Swiss-Prot record:
Residues 56-69 have a biased composition (Polar residues). Residues 1-69 are annotated as: Disordered. Keywords: Nucleus, Protein transport, Repeat, Transport. Pfam families: Arm, Arm_3, IBB. It comes from Arabidopsis thaliana (Mouse-ear cress). Belongs to the importin alpha family. Residues 7-46 have a biased composition (Basic and acidic residues). The keyword Metal-binding does not apply. The gene is IMPA6. This is Importin subunit alpha-6. It is found in: Nucleus envelope.
């Protein structure tokens, strides 16, 4: 078999793409990579509906237009309920609004669309201004909260009726239950879409929301306010950082809560705020959240662990100094634990992605990864992990070969990285193949340097190890790959580290043409001599 470049390779040289370089080693999160984000809490609870329990302020059934009746029957009463809302009688207003609230709070399939289509929403919104009638404000806020838990069209009706500024005003109500219900409603509106979120923020909701976090807040308020705060920070395009960064001091305090729901939503909020430029990352670091986030890597609940890991992963996409802030907070033992124990695929994948951004740092940071004992478990995942995990683990190893010194690369080889790297070469993901080739090339460079120093005789031992791992055949096969970047990288490696061996085989062969230049092509047994200038295919 000839390991020289094929004729196809020569034709394609002019379309060569630049391979992975040092600047690409540290990666921001790619949208198509973020499977971990698709957990139930993250995707399904952008909105929440309040069901029909009875807090102290909830109106008790009196002249109840809706309670204990089938939905169809209750819908038949909707005109009577609308008449009650539009009445001048305070008691009828309250009871009708409470009836709508109960109708919208049933457990399954609440008739939100039917209520919206009845045209009653703007009238209920007006009740939010009734500072003289706190109970009516509460019932109206609850009903509107549940309408806002519906479709985007439902939420648009709430916004178009002018409810958002009124909800923001209610955050200053003397009634904690009214304030909490307003918090919930704003969370549902903001959770609908980035456009709705930005509308809420434009109504100066952030500072009023942050005022709800104090030492006397009830747990239910803390839970709702933290969830709403996370909705204020989430979504792409991202909200204006000048508005959302004001939440950082509160989020730092919330991270020390013992409540799982509060911890979960506070951590998600931080993950959104840390997803961006180095300037944003630095602002998050300056808030002092890293030590507690590192502690949360050991939290027993995945719902807390996942966003904490996500935030740490975002921070290490920053520069070396920002990455060092994570390392210095003892994050590496926590990441090692995630690799070694029986966590689900998405967590291991995220941990590998985080480590890959640390190994994209300087040599001392790579050394700290080595000293933490992370490399062998990482290589183990490269050997036996699911493919989605391998895709991230190979980045971690390849980045270490790119930024590591010769001794560090020799250590990687001693830990058994060559064979699993070679095993990834036939994989269908071009990016993974490219990154794998980069890692192998960096290893081969060290092997060549050792040979030139006379430490390994006349042999590049790492080239031999790659050949023993069936890597040479796989690299040679990549010359026919459809991706220019891959096959050019394969050609470069073959020319640099195996061409001499191939030439010796040609020269020593019994039927080798006498005058074919080393850059020519061998076609098998030939008795005729080639032209001294090589074959002309023009």
């Amino acid at each position: 078999m000839s390991y020289k470049p094929s004729a196809k390779t020569e034709v394609r040289r002019n379309r060569y793409k630049v391979s992975v370089d040092a600047d690409e080693g540290r990666r921001r999160r790619e949208d198509n990579m973020v499977e971990i984000r698709k957990n139930k809490r993250e995707e399904n609870l952008q909105k929440k509906r309040r069901e029909g329990f009875n807090p102290s302020m909830a109106s008790q059934p009196g002249q109840d237009f809706s309670s204990s009746l089938p939905t169809e029957t209750r819908l038949e009463n909707i005109q009577q309920m609308i008449a009650g809302v539009m009445s001048e009688d305070r008691d009828l207003q309250l009871e009708a609004t409470a009836s709508f609230r109960r109708l919208l709070s049933i457990e399954r399939n609440p008739p939100i669309n039917e209520v919206v289509q009845s045209g009653v929403v703007p009238h209920i919104v007006q009740f939010l201004s009734r500072d003289d009638f706190t109970q009516l404000q509460f019932e109206a806020a609850w009903a509107l909260t549940n309408i806002a838990s519906g479709t985007s069209e439902n939420t648009r009706v709430i916004i178009d009726s002018g409810a958002v500024p009124l909800f923001v005003k209610l955050l200053s109500s003397a009634s904690e239950e009214v304030r909490e219900q307003a918090v919930w409603a704003l969370g549902n509106v903001a959770g609908d879409s980035p456009k709705c979120r930005d509308h809420v923020l434009s109504c100066e909701a952030m500072m009023s929301l942050l005022a709800q976090f104090h030492e006397h807040s009830k747990l239910s308020m803390l839970r709702n306010a933290t969830w709403t705060l996370s909705n204020f920070c989430r979504g792409k395009p991202q909200p204006a950082f000048e508005q959302t960064k004001a939440a950082l001091p509160a989020l730092e305090r919330l991270l020390h809560s013992t409540d799982e729901e509060v911890l979960t939503d506070a951590s998600w909020a931080l993950s959104y705020l840390s997803d961006g430029t180095n300037e944003k990352i630095q602002t998050v670091i300056d808030a002092g959240v890293i030590p507690r986030l590192v502690q949360l890597l050991a939290h027993p609940s995945p719902s807390v662990l996942i966003p904490a890991l996500r935030t740490i992963g975002n921070i290490v996409t920053g520069d070396d100094i920002q990455t060092q802030a994570v390392i210095s907070s003892q994050a590496l033992p926590g990441l090692l634990n995630l690799l070694k124990n029986t966590y689900k695929k998405s967590i291991k994948k995220e941990a590998c992605w985080t480590i890959s951004n640390i190994t994209a740092g300087n040599t001392s940071q790579i050394q700290e990864v080595f000293q933490a004992g992370i490399i062998r478990p990482l290589i183990n995942l490269l050997e036996i992990g699911e493919f989605e995990i391998k895709k991230e683990a190979v980045w971690a190893i390849s980045n270490a070969t790119s930024g590591g010194n010769h001794d560090q690369i020799k250590f990687l080889v001693s830990q058994g990285c060559i064979r699993p790297l070679c095993d990834l070469l036939p994989c269908p993901d071009p990016r993974v193949v490219t990154v794998t080739l980069e890692g192998l090339e960096n290893i081969l460079k060290v092997g060549e340097a050792e040979k030139n120093l006379g430490n390994t005789g006349n042999d590049n031992l790492y080239a031999q190890m790659i050949e023993d791992a069936d890597g040479l055949d796989k690299i040679e096969n990549l010359q026919s790959h459809d991706n220019n970047e891959i096959y050019e990288k394969a050609v470069k490696i073959l020319e640099s580290y195996w061409a001499a061996d191939d030439e010796e085989e040609d020269i020593g062969g019994v039927d080798a043409p006498e005058n074919v230049q080393s850059s020519g092509f061998q076609f098998g047994n030939q008795s005729g001599n080639a032209p001294t200038g090589g074959f002309n295919f023009g």
